[in-house]
Amino acid sequence: MLKDCRDINTELLVAGTILHDIGKLFELDTNEFGASEYTVKGTLMGHAFLGAELAGRVAREEGLNEEDIMLLQHLILSHHGKQEYEAVTVPAIPEALVLHHIDMIDSYMYQFETQAEGLKPGEMSGKVFGLDQRVYRPTWRVPQKKEESEEKK
């Protein structure tokens, strides 16, 4: 689909997609059991700012030009889409808008799949806050348990 969008810089979009959450490495402190807590730096600055700062520093060391660095940082800083969703700024270029929507689809699908996992086939959930809708698990969509799919390999 994106190949039909003539004005999309796919290299920039792919780089932004890969790096948009890189700041979470510094925002969160995760222990060996997978439990996470926010770091002081992460709480004060947020993962978008920390990621944009890191990406800018590394890109300069690699010799990228300043406009490309600025645009990559813009994707990272604006990937939440709206300031009320904790975006530092709003998308101002097509690649940033596309990245925001990719990130939203990822978030929606995670919520949808997590909700559906707790349902029996043919069952409907209550209203899911983050989706602002209910979720239905079709009778034909019965995902295999992880152990079953591992045994078949």
Features from the language model and the residues they span:
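Acidic, carboxylate-rich catalytic segments that either coordinate divalent cations
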Residues: 95-153
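Divalent metal-dependent catalytic cores for phosphoryl transfer on phosphate-bearing substrates
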Residues: 3-118
